[in-house]
A protein has these predicted regions:
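Cytosolic nucleotide-utilizing catalytic cores of signal-transduction proteins
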Residues: 1-249
Length: 249
């Protein structure tokens, strides 16, 4: 990794992108070319040497990348992503890196504004925490797949228990515990797959007819139509907020 790329990476990831733009415009125009993507990489057990090896691997196979390593994370900024071939190559490189070095990674979507680098890094870090908790067997994740969960995790301190159908959802979970039913998890999986009965049944490892029966009972218990899009979205957000609260406790 060249010295100039290290310097630019430090400026960009330490929030001095505008200063870089104003002070060294020629260098900026030559090296930092939109569109961008950010990737955040970490080890399951902190290992700085492993992170550095992984960063070197990415730099060797993909030229237009800036690498910044801080504490337990390696932050990567991919630049000049103008073709579908580039986008696919980045995904493949990061997936291969995760497997080769046994690391966890989250990759952001494309963006053009340099001011968004820090926010994209934050969102990737959040997505990585959430995704690894939900899918511990996976190593490579995409920020956009966890957008709702990221937003919920940020909103939790401000919303608290003032969530949509808070009492009803809590009672649903309590009934599951008392009667050993799985209505709460069934509802969550159903909403996560966009109210698709067959997909939800598959995720729950139950027959489609069993899923339909459970959903009808859930409708009765909650007293709302969970298939109405506006209601479904609000319930899903409430469930994600409740789960985020449990994880933080």
């Amino acid at each position: 990794i060249s010295t100039i790329r290290r310097v630019i990476a430090r400026l960009l990831f330490e929030g001095e992108g505008k200063q870089l733009l104003n002070g060294t415009n020629d260098i900026y125009n030559e090296y930092v070319v939109a569109p961008f993507r950010v990737a955040v990489v970490r080890a399951e057990v902190y290992n700085s040497l492993q992170l550095q090896k992984a960063a070197n691997y990415v730099s060797d196979v993909y030229e237009n990348v800036f690498v910044y390593i801080e504490e337990q994370y390696a932050c990567l900024l991919f630049t000049d992503i103008h073709t579908e071939e580039c986008r696919e190559k980045i995904c493949k490189v990061m997936d291969n890196m995760c497997e080769k070095y046994k690391l966890l990674c989250c990759l952001s979507g494309s963006f053009n504004e340099i001011e968004l680098i820090d926010k994209k890094r934050f969102m990737c870090q959040k997505a990585l925490e959430i995704a690894h908790e939900q899918e511990p067997d996976k190593r490579s994740f995409r920020e956009e797949d966890y957008y709702v969960q990221i937003v919920c995790s940020c909103a939790l301190p401000y919303i608290g228990h003032a969530r949509y159908l808070e009492r009803e959802l809590t009672e649903l979970a309590s009934e599951d515990e008392a009667k050993e039913t799985k209505f709460y998890e069934t509802l969550k999986q159903y909403l996560l797959v966009g109210n698709n009965v067959s997909m939800a049944a598959k995720k729950m490892f139950i027959h489609r007819n069993t899923m339909i029966y459970r959903l009808s009972k859930i409708n009765e218990i909650l007293g709302v139509d969970i298939n109405e899009p506006g209601i479904a979205h609000k319930i899903l957000i409430s469930i994600l907020l409740q789960e985020q609260e449990k994880e933080e406790k």
